[in-house]
């Protein structure tokens, strides 16, 4: 009875996603790539980074680290699956300018450094530096609330709130 009355012991399905990069937060529809802008990979936001560091947006586990180190997948404790894709068409760089600081299966806390990258090199060699942050299991989410139009600080600015079904 007290558990229900005071919410004690209840597991929350809500996850706060903090900015994995420092920069301007934009609507996912502003990404100059139809796959991300059309939400085909999932709903979310994008950040135009001002520095070359990606941190974990949640407490969770690294479920995928692309061998080219340009993209990483994290699973939050509530089941939210987050893909961070640094820049557009960066896969063609074949890992040049990217360094991973974590490995698959590793537990991480919000704010832990995941990837560092050469922002100038991406500007020079890729289509864009804009970085989509998407919820890949959007169909399992009850709601995704985004915060756009702000300048985010990595590891602290809330950019999404995801409630799972």
Curated annotation (Swiss-Prot):
- Tell me where in this chain the PTS EIIA type-1 domain is found: 33-137
Main localization of the protein?
cytoplasm
Could you give the cofactor binding note from the entry?
A: Binds 1 zinc ion per glycerol kinase EIIA-Glc dimer. The zinc ion is important for dimerization.
Catalytic positions are 85
Per its record, what are the GO molecular function terms?
Answer: kinase activity; metal ion binding
Query: Where does the record say this protein resides?
Result: Cytoplasm
Q: Where does Zn(2+) bind?
A: 70, 85
One short Pfam name that applies is PTS_EIIA_1
Residues bearing Phosphohistidine?
85
Q: Which InterPro entries match?
A: Dup_hybrid_motif, PTS_EIIA_1_perm, PTS_EIIA_component
Site (Important for phospho-donor activity) at 70
Q: Which keywords annotate this record?
A: Cytoplasm, Kinase, Metal-binding, Phosphoprotein, Phosphotransferase system, Sugar transport, Transferase, Transport, Zinc
Q: Which cofactor does it need?
A: Zn(2+)
Q: Which GO terms describe its biological process?
A: phosphoenolpyruvate-dependent sugar phosphotransferase system
Coiled coil segments of this chain = none
Q: Which GO terms describe its cellular component?
A: cytoplasm
What the protein does? The phosphoenolpyruvate-dependent sugar phosphotransferase system (sugar PTS), a major carbohydrate active transport system, catalyzes the phosphorylation of incoming sugar substrates concomitantly with their translocation across the cell membrane. The enzyme II complex composed of PtsG and Crr is involved in glucose transport.
Subunit text: Heterodimer with glycerol kinase (glpk).
Q: What is known of its domains?
A: The EIIA domain is phosphorylated by phospho-HPr on a histidyl residue. Then, it transfers the phosphoryl group to the EIIB domain.
User: What name goes with this protein?
Assistant: PTS system glucose-specific EIIA component
Taxonomy of origin reads: Bacteria, Bacillati, Bacillota, Bacilli, Bacillales
